[in-house]
Amino acid sequence: MKDKGFTLIELLVVVAIIGILAAVGVVAYSGYTYGAKKNALISRHELSVKFLMSEFQKCNTGQKFYLNNSQSFDQCSRVLNPGSSTTKNLTKSIISHFNNVNGWKNIYDNTLAGSKEGSAKNCEKGFVCVGGYVSDRITKTVNYDDVQSNFISKIIFLDY
């Protein structure tokens, strides 16, 4: 009588092949998700810079510039008359706008806000940092890796 079924060797070969394919797939998927998060973060940075530059231009043409869906405070006074305290307040309003109105979360840890105060030196992974440490400019920085040197920074000058 002939037994039907697979031998132990055949089963072990199949399990080994599945294991190798799974290991390769996990590495490839990990690289794919890292690249997608990095690209999303860089895109968020570029969009926020374009948004701020266009809003700052409104001030130059006599229009009003509001943040946080609030029509109560025109930010143009902070843009057109920069100083250390006004730039600092503008920075805080920008951070609040991106976190609350846009609902930004940290791409690598969605329990954290997506935007915070900081510069290229102290911008942590996954954040779009806004710095207003110099009275005539806003600095937007994004850090897309654990390595501190992997960041993109853009300076937006005030007082158009």
Identify the function of each model-found stretch:
Residues 2-33:
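N-terminal single-pass transmembrane signal-anchor helix
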Residues 5-9, 18, 48, 87, ...:
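Generic N-terminal initiation segments characterized by hydrophobic and/or small/turn-forming residues
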Residues 9, 43, 49-50, 81-83:
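Intrinsically disordered, low-complexity segments enriched in polar/charged small residues
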Residues 14-16, 24-25, 45-50, 54-57, ...:
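Functionally constrained cores in energy, signaling, and assembly domains
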Residues 34-64:
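Membrane-proximal N-terminal amphipathic helix
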Residues 57-160:
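Periplasmic/extracellular, small/polar-rich flexible segments of pilin-like filament-forming proteins
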